[in-house]
């Protein structure tokens, strides 16, 4: 089996998309390929068919490889709950909560498990494309590293180092990273990649030659800056406002926002523009307000209260349409109770009181794939998605359920999810990916179009669009990199 590891000079330099591109290229060339990231830190996660939790970047990479996402592609997932604490997910299930120092002291015990996972991949696939995290030059973390050079050494993988020229200082970051590596680590780095380049590459070439003289490894290519409609899990990046897009969707950007990838399918609508808001001054008059998921719902509710957005949301709810997802659904209720102090020591807190329901946080985390139908006799409306939450919500007779769940992790079930008020303009659900399917997204956006005097439209199938974008990504990267050299590095062709 062949293997290659993509590391970067920093976070957000484009490692995840380079891995996805290589997965798609190798697949196109007829090889069985699998992505692997030993440890990921992200608030954007996904639930596999067997109910396990993993990072979204490896989900996109799995699709690029033509595979169903599996938790073994990302055995360790860290989900920050505050600046100093995180929830640890191991093999798709909650392992526990820890401080940064606690996990630092803990992680070496996972090395054997990671090696076992990788050995299994060696048996099942022709090529494994690995991804590092942050930078391999974090010298204070070197002795307990299990995600960058520590993982590369564990499985004897060659490394390609990616730098982001769009940030500026790419030559310094590449040379500086190499300077801080140990001799054995330097020998693993077989080439550099410059990512996100804008302009004429001829102007860059003298710098590439000088860089090679300094670091003594070749530059394998320059990848142009490209806007793609693919998920970004590293942070809630600002959406690009579309010119002349008549439908304005505002999204509350809370401090602990999670699973904002729920919004990606909305970006596929040509006449829809999405913007984040963090203050009441930015609120304005959106056609739809989305309150997304949160890793700390109570803290984010306090944030809405403190910055004045609570007042703006309540005023908007009189005539505007609101969709809350997971934590965003919970804050719409009248009360949130936390008897086991899962999130804070407050015990309970009043919600926005836009839906007559109460949420209680439990000790056990719900992680499940679901299929549901919208409770609307006029429409055959099916939604596929997943749930990740620790709260159970109960509502009064004044509130109608939004969906009926009929499949849970492949088993037939029959229970309700979500809620919608009597007026029909405020609703919420626990289902992540609720907009990914055509029917519900099309229904919501067409209601907004009609309200503005616009014609209804058919929505794109998000999965088809994603496949086209992955092929586009692969084409760009194939044309930009020396693939013959990369095949030589991994010992193939």
UniProtKB/Swiss-Prot annotation:
Keyword Cell division belongs to the record: no
Residues annotated as catalytic: 326, 432
Domain GATase cobBQ-type: 246-440
Protein's GO biological process: cobalamin biosynthetic process
Pathway: Cofactor biosynthesis; adenosylcobalamin biosynthesis
Annotated keywords: Cobalamin biosynthesis, Glutamine amidotransferase
SUPFAM superfamilies associated with the record: Class I glutamine amidotransferase-like, P-loop containing nucleoside triphosphate hydrolases
GO molecular function: ABC-type vitamin B12 transporter activity; catalytic activity
PROSITE patterns: GATASE_COBBQ
Lineage: superkingdom: Bacteria
Family listed: Belongs to the CobB/CobQ family. CobQ subfamily.
UniProt-listed HAMAP family: CobQ
Protein's job: Catalyzes amidations at positions B, D, E, and G on adenosylcobyrinic A,C-diamide. NH(2) groups are provided by glutamine, and one molecule of ATP is hydrogenolyzed for each amidation.
Protein name, as recorded: Cobyric acid synthase
Lineage: Bacteria, Bacillati, Bacillota, Clostridia, Eubacteriales
Gene (name only): cobQ
